[in-house]
Structures are given as structure tokens and as C-alpha cells.
Amino acid sequence: MDNKKLNTLIESIDQWVIESNDEKISELYRQSSKADNEFEDIPILKDCITLAFNILLGDSLVGSFKTDLMKKLFLLDSLNNYKDNINEYFEKVNNNITSLNETPLNQLSVLLSGITFLNLYVQINWTGPTVQISPDFTLKNDNKSILELLEVDGETVYKKVKNPIFLYLSKICLVDNYSMLDSCKSSCWWSCRSVMYHQRSLKNATPTFKSLLNERFQIVTRFYSISTLLEDSEEFMDTSSSTTSESKKSIKEINGLKDLASRAIIEQSLVFNYFRQLNKIKESMERACEVSELDCALTGALGKRTRFQTFDTAQLVMEVKNCRQRDDSGDGDNNNEFNRNSSIKREVTNDDPTLLVRPSLIEEVKGQNILLRNVDQMLILLQCLNVKNQNSNNGLTTEEMLPYIQKTLEKSNNWIIHSMGLLIKSRLEIVSSKTAERAVLQIQALVDQYDDPTSSATERINAIYSTDYPARWDLEKEVAERFIGIGAAASAFEIFERLEMWDEAIKCLTFMGKNSRSEELVLQRLEIEPSPELYCVLGDLKSDEQFYIKGWELSKKRYSRAQRSLARFYLEREQYQLCIDAFQIALAINPLFPNSWFSLGCAAMKIEKWDTALNAFSRVVSLEPEEGEGWANLASIYMYQNKMDKASSALMEGLKHKRENWKMWENFLFCCIAIKDYQNAVIAINHIFDLNDKKVNLKLLSIIADHVVSKDQLDKQGISGSKMEKTVSELFGRLTSKLTNNPDLWRLYSSYHHRLGNVDKAIDLQQKACRSCESAHWEGEQSTFEKVLQFNTTLCDLYFQYPNTSNIYSAKLKVKSILKKCESSWKETEHYKNFEQLLIKLNNYESELLQKK
């Protein structure tokens, strides 16, 4: 085989593996198995074909270990010799790889080996079914050494993870030696997958992996954009010159490329979701739908939700407006190994006597019976996650998410996709007392199906990377958490104890009132195997800082949780500087903890370390853009520093997520007035009025009124006062219609119209102001007495400016009435005497007006 043909074949194998083209790989494997085949002279290539076949179609990935390639490269025949020094084994494997000539064939062999190890690790810990692994790979004593090697940014791998050696070997092949795989186009994508499942094996998100995944997925989505894939493809559809069979083949291949491009974006979106980069998910999801040509939306349809419902009501359902048809065979969309009937049995209905599993519709919705491609089902699951991310956790969000799940479960034909749909459905149902039991049983069924024979390992692996399906230990943890929710704390404790999740186990014991048993359990575990985590748990139980410090020292100052716990210990005792110091140490190791940044910011504000607080809350909102309280505190610091523009922007962001917080609206109002953003100030006043028991800040309202009266003066947005006149007039009208007994508001409203030249309106409003201030027994209090006189004086001044006989006459009668009512109590006061002079002036005015007539 000449070099050109060899290199072309290597590129093809690389492409077929990443797109799961089992038809092409199967055909190639059959050719390589024949006698006198063209691959006999290239044993490494033949082994690579075997590896590729096992990755996509083999009964067991372990079969790849029998190839000479893997035996030699990974020292499989002598693995047992390194049980006492696993570090030496990893070094030798790495040396074997780095010493290879960087030929395309050698690069492909390293890539496929890394994929084999990664898929094995994921199969064992995520998808199942159980695989028989050689005892040489089961290093019970040395697993601790491997777990330490897999620590990143102070975050540890789950202690009871199975066969972490496979994750480390995939890391050596796909991540550590990534630079030598430049001839393999898919190496970047597989590197991302290895990193992502390494991250998902850790207890918390890490900045190192966040940065790495964001950077490399940009390369992946560029390499695997649909335009790039179509350009690189040698065959393209040309219906004008092709036969029908060739045309169908071309359509199928183009659909495969669209699936591949869509999956690249889906996996990037799952990274965004994991690291809470929520602002990026919507855009990437829309791109994926565009590439896959999927157009779906929620709509309403009449139907029944309960078994005994006698009338039809509106149901929220999904309408598929456009999508590509599912292929007849070959792309994994119609895998015969997946038994549809068996999958339906895995959906727990619990024979609910009232609720239907799905709404029964009176007529079919567009796209209801369409067979969606696997990639489109993955996209719908992703859209469901986006609904949850974009909305608060309430009943409306649940109702909006359910149609996505129901659509996925209707016609799904992939084991992992169907399982993911069932899992999300159970998470939604757990909040309702009517469906909580069914939800718990459903998650338990998903745990029990690990060895379900209806789906092969290769089918599960093919879809796992494009879904958010949890690890087996996380799924069992979720079962235990649901048990607590329905009151079965003892059952939950048994699960947590078996999983060695001591934090959660202690919470169960506390929930059951067994506090002494909690401490006893931790001390027992410390005697068996001391760990930083257990010392932190003991510190929580005893409220003693020395245990956090001991855990920190035991971890060689790498376990950031110890410093976070220590910081909260100091925060509770108002030792703010010590709290700040501890948080800064913890966050220097792993800064992806928004709650810790928030607490650090609060502590810094307490001792007026404004720069520290500003940095802390800036980090909070960058990690959690929907954290309204973080935006509010950030704005408070800006306001303290008199940076009103920045404060206003921060509050505007925060109010997107905390619209019911009237205090934030009040701060926003102050900022808007300070920067002369009167349009938003009006919005703020309306919200404060609605949320805070009809409270109105008249001083700030008068500033807005002054702007309108100024006519030509522009505000921050370039809006003149005259253009805001209608808006502000409507604001006054709304406020006074709901707050009728506030004389100061009526007076301000009157003054506003007076200055605009609306005299009759001003007089009418001032009359209402006068009436509203004359409460019962007003003459008995000096303050109310003076206010009544002041308001009526203002009304008379309006009459004097625009006199007519009837107004002056009614004013004279009103003043006489007030003077008579107050004579006994306030006759000797200056206000009373001035009011008497007002009566004289009214009499004179009346005489003058009568003479003119």
C-alpha cells in the first residue's frame, strides 16, 4: 500500500470513528480479516482497524488489549510488575508514546488506544453494562496513588470510582500527548471528551479544565462546522447527474455530516451548562438547531391530563415544524439491538389512579408521529436544560419542560437518550406529592438497568458524550436524596454509607436525630483511613477550627474545602479578616465557587474593604450571571464609591433575576436620578409602588417632574422633557388613582400641571390635595393644622393668579370655615393671623371682581 493511499485510509478511519460510521468500519474490518489482505504487511494498521471495530461494534472493548499494538505500547503483559509503583508504569507508557515516530499511523494508534481506554472508563462508571476486567487492572491498593495523580486544582476524584487507571491512560494518550496527534483531525474532540469525563469524576468544577475545554471546543466547532465538513467531503450530492441510489447515498452522507456538526455544538453546550456559562448556551443551541435543520416550538392543544377528566383543556405540547428524516439504517438511528418494547417497560408509571403519563390529545399536533433523529432528540433534551437555566424553579418551569421530555420519550430509539429523558422527567415529578413516589422509583429503575441486556455497550457509548447522563455514583446519590425527600432517611443513609459519601451520610443521621452516631461514625472512619474530607466533616460536627486546619495540613495545603469551611467558621463568629484570609487561600486554588466569593464580599463589606468586596462580587456575577443579590451588592459598592453609572448597570442586570425585590428597585431609582436616566426612573417608581405597599418617594418624583417642565432639557438617553410629558402624566394618574389619601402627592401633581400651564387641572388637583389633608380632628394637632392652612393658601394663590368670582367666593367660605374651626386652639399663632390676612385679601379680590362686572 503506497503512502498516499495509507494516509487517506488513516484519515477515513479517524473520520468514521468520530462519526460512528459502523458500516464503513465493519466493511474495513471484514477486509482486514480475509486471508492475503492488503493490510498483512502493516500489522499496526491491522491492529488499528481492530481497535476501531471494537470501539464501534465490538462485544467488548477489552478485546483490544489482545492486539500487539496495545500490548507493546502499554506493557500489558508485564502490568503486574508495576503494581508496587504505578507512577513508574505511567512514566514508561508515556515514554513509549513520546518515543514513537510522529507518523500518521502511529498517531492513529495512540488516538484509538486513548479512545479505547476512555470508552472503557465511561462504560464501567457511567453507562454499563458490567465488563470483565483483568485483575491486573484492578489495583485496590494503588488506586489511591492514581486518584492523587488525577487531582486538579485541589479537587479530588470520587473515592470509589472504578478502574481510574483507564482514565489516566486515556489522559496520557489524548491530553498529555495531544500535541503529537496533529495528523488526526478528531484528536482535539477526543481530548475534550477525556477532559470532560475527568472533570465529571471530580467533586467540583475546576478553572484549569474550564479554560482548557472552552479553548479546545472552539477548535472542535471550527474543524467540525458543517461548511468545513462539506468542503472536506470528497462526495457531494448532485441529483442532476447521479442515479437514484447514488443520490440517496449522498443524502445519507450529508446527513451524517450534519449530525456530526450538530453533536460538536451540543457537546460544547454541555460544557457551557456544566460550568454555568448560561449566557452562551442559548446561542450555541440555536446554531445546533440551524445545522441540524430542527425547528420545534411549544404550542397549545386541547386534551385531557387526568384519567377521569370529562372535558378537554389546553395542554402544552411540542410541535415539530421541520426536521430531517431518520435514516433507514446505518447511522445508529435505527439500531436493531435496542428493543423499543423493553425501553417502554423501563418507564415507571406506578399505575397512577388519577394522572395520565402523557396528555391525551383530541387531535394530532404537527410532527407528533415523526421519527426524530438521535441528534435531534439530543437537541430537544438540551433545549429542556436551557428552559431550566433561563427560569426560576417553579411550577411554570416544570410545565414548560415536560413537553420536551414527552417528545423525547415518544419515539426514542437510543438507550441513553431514553434514559436521560426518563431521568429529567423524574426530576420534574419529584416536586409534586402526587408523583414523588413514582419519580423515586423511576430513578431507582435507572440505577437497576445498568446491566440491562437490551442495549449494547457500543450503542450507549455512542450517545453518552452528547447527553448529560450522570455517573453511576451520582445517580445512586440522587436516589438517596429523593429518599430523604419522601422521609426514608434510613434508606438514604445506607446508600450514602455504601458510597462513602460521608457529608451526606452525616446529614441523614442529623435528620434522624442521631447526632452522637454521626460523630462516632466519623471517628471510626478516621481510624481506618484519615482523609482531609473526614476532618472537615468532623470540624462541622464539633464546630472546631482545629479539624479544618488538620485537614488542610493533611492534604499538603491542596484541599480547598478545608479553607472554605474555616472561612465560614470565622464568618459565623464575625472574625471578618480571618474569614477573608481563609477564603482568599481557598479561592486561589479553585476560584469556581460563587457562594464563597459572595461570602468573601460580604465579609469585606463589613470591615469596609471596598476593593476586595468589589472584586469578590464581580467574580460572583461572572460565575453566576443570574445571581441577583450579587449584582445588588456590587451596585451598593459602586454607589458607595459614587460610580452611579456602573451601579445603575449592575442593578439593571440584577433586576432581570430579582424583579420582586423592591429594595433593589429603590437603589436603581436613586442611581437613575443621579445619572438623569428619567425613563428608567419612571419604571422603578412604578415597581416600588407595586411591591412596597404603595410607597412613593416624592422628592425623586419631583425631580422627574422638573425635567418634564424644563421641556428642552435632555436626559441620559437623550430624551427631552416634552417627550416624557405623556409618560410622567400617566405615572401621576396611576399613582393618585391607587393612593387617594396622600395630600403631598396631590399637591405635587397639581404643581406639575400648573407649571405645564394646565391651570384648570392644577386647581382641581390642589382642591383634592386640600380635601385629603383634612383628616379627622386635624385641627387638634399643630402639624396638621399648619398643613391644612398651607395647602389652602396654595389653592388661594392659584385662584388669585387666575381669578373668577365663583372660585374666590368658594375660597372665602372655605377660609372662614377653617378659621372658625381653629379659633379656639390656634388664634394666637402666626399661622392663624396670616390666614386671617388671606381672608381679607379674598374679600378685597371679590369686591374688585364685582366692580369690574
Swiss-Prot record:
SUPFAM superfamilies hit by this protein: TPR-like
Repeat among keywords: yes
Keyword Repeat: yes
PROSITE patterns noted in UniProt: TPR, TPR_REGION
Keyword tags: Repeat, TPR repeat
Source domain of life: Eukaryota
Region (Disordered): 324-345
One Pfam family matching this protein: TPR_16
Compositionally biased spans, kind Polar residues: 332-342
InterPro entries on file: TPR-like_helical_dom_sf (IPR011990), TPR_rpt (IPR019734), TTC27/Emw1 (IPR044244)
Family listed: Belongs to the TTC27 family.
Name of the protein described by the UniProt record: Tetratricopeptide repeat protein 27 homolog
Organism ancestry: Eukaryota, Amoebozoa, Evosea, Eumycetozoa, Dictyostelia
